[in-house]
Amino acid sequence: MISKSRKTKETDITVSLDINGNGKSKIDTGVGFLDHMLDSFSKHSLIDLEITCKGDTHIDDHHSVEDIGIVLGALFAEALYPVSNMERFGSANIVMDEACVSCDLDLSNRPYLVYEVNLAGKVGQFDTELVEEFFRAFVLNARISTHIVLQRGKNRHHIIEAAFKAVAVALRRAMQKNERVGIPSTKDML
């Protein structure tokens, strides 16, 4: 496992991960719904993940959610690059009851996020617009091109969980070892 910490006036975060793990997790962000999503992300990506966060959640969850995405993304990039002997591209359509979310991604070292999941409101006390903030912070710092698209769904919890699982499975597929591909780019570098 490798680790990274970040401390600001708003948050104090430590993240450890192993991209070649078994999907074990120990998550304590101070944001219960995010803990649930990150546990699911770890399980379905097979990335071992430990996260602790103490944040100013008495204000709201925004700083904690975004800063966790920043630290997790930066640590993921540290573990991943340079990409070699991996598939590089990954896709997943994840169904959770009535909800279906797709994720297509490229371990390109070029960050870009397309997020077409139009949600408003809350799941419990969790503001649903924070999901986009998390993924934007993660993708920009992980330096991956990622498209997350809601195909259908009504239940906010199901939609968000399907999104986290779709990203997780797409990452697992993109990180699949393939010794034949070498550096998976015609540029011979990523």
Curated annotation (Swiss-Prot):
Keywords: Amino-acid biosynthesis, Cytoplasm, Histidine biosynthesis, Lyase. GO terms for biological process: L-histidine biosynthetic process. It comes from Sulfurimonas denitrificans (strain ATCC 33889 / DSM 1251) (Thiomicrospira denitrificans (strain ATCC 33889 / DSM 1251)). InterPro entries: IGPD_sf, ImidazoleglycerolP_deHydtase, ImidazoleglycerP_deHydtase_CS, Ribosomal_Su5_D2-typ_SF. GO terms for molecular function: imidazoleglycerol-phosphate dehydratase activity. GO terms for cellular component: cytoplasm. Belongs to the imidazoleglycerol-phosphate dehydratase family. It is an enzyme of class 4 (lyase). It holds the Pfam family IGPD. Its EC number is 4.2.1.19. This is Imidazoleglycerol-phosphate dehydratase.
